[in-house]
Amino acid sequence: MARYIGPKCKLSRREGTDLFLKSGARALDSKCNMETAPGQHGQRRGRLSDYGLQLREKQKVRRMYGVLEKQFRNYYKEAARIKGATGENLLQLLERRLDNVVYRMGFGSTRSEARQLVSHKAILVNGKAVNIPSYQVKPGDVVSIREKSKNQLRIKGSLELAAQRATLEWIEVDAAKMSGTFKSVPERTDLSPDINENLIVELYSK
């Protein structure tokens, strides 16, 4: 399956939430009507079956983190093998993706932009270039911007946006040095309450 590169508003309207919130601070354009599903007539959403709710939640989270279907299923399988709650494990694996950590640290204004920075070798992990967006960051890892990439205007703009949001407990960032430390794996209470990971577990458990 190819990665979706179409209008972000369309996907967000499909899921009924802003999937691409810029650095957790700036929402999509006000013209993007979240109350109606995409389409010519913008029909309002009908009542979904249990399966429909489970599928929508899975699609919402998958698109939020920018993960393809096969990769998302593999994350679920890995989460199920780890000791603890499968749903929480799944979210923690997604949060540990390098592109997500770059986004959380404010170096990319969206996860998509953060993924580009990683792919273009603008990101260092413990002083070494890593260009794999799915790379799993570990507690204590230092993630920073490569020296020759520090003058990119989009990175500076992203850090300005990130300054508007609340500080995350599991990440420490030195904006001046364009460097941050992944202090610990976030607890479930640290993550969005708008995600119902139990629906995803129910879907894949069938």
Curated annotation (Swiss-Prot):
One of its GO terms (molecular function) is structural constituent of ribosome. GO terms for biological process: ribosomal small subunit biogenesis; translation. InterPro entries: Ribosomal_uS4, Ribosomal_uS4_bac-type, Ribosomal_uS4_CS, Ribosomal_uS4_N, S4_RNA-bd, S4_RNA-bd_sf. Keywords: Ribonucleoprotein, Ribosomal protein, RNA-binding, rRNA-binding. SMART domains: Ribosomal_S4 (SM01390), S4 (SM00363). It holds the Pfam family S4. Residues 96-156 form the S4 RNA-binding domain. GO terms for cellular component: small ribosomal subunit. Gene3D superfamilies: Ribosomal Protein S4 Delta 41, Chain A, domain 1 (1.10.1050.10), RNA-binding S4 domain (3.10.290.10). It comes from the Bacteria. Belongs to the universal ribosomal protein uS4 family. HAMAP family: Ribosomal_uS4_B (MF_01306_B). One of the primary rRNA binding proteins, it binds directly to 16S rRNA where it nucleates assembly of the body of the 30S subunit. With S5 and S12 plays an important role in translational accuracy. This is Small ribosomal subunit protein uS4.
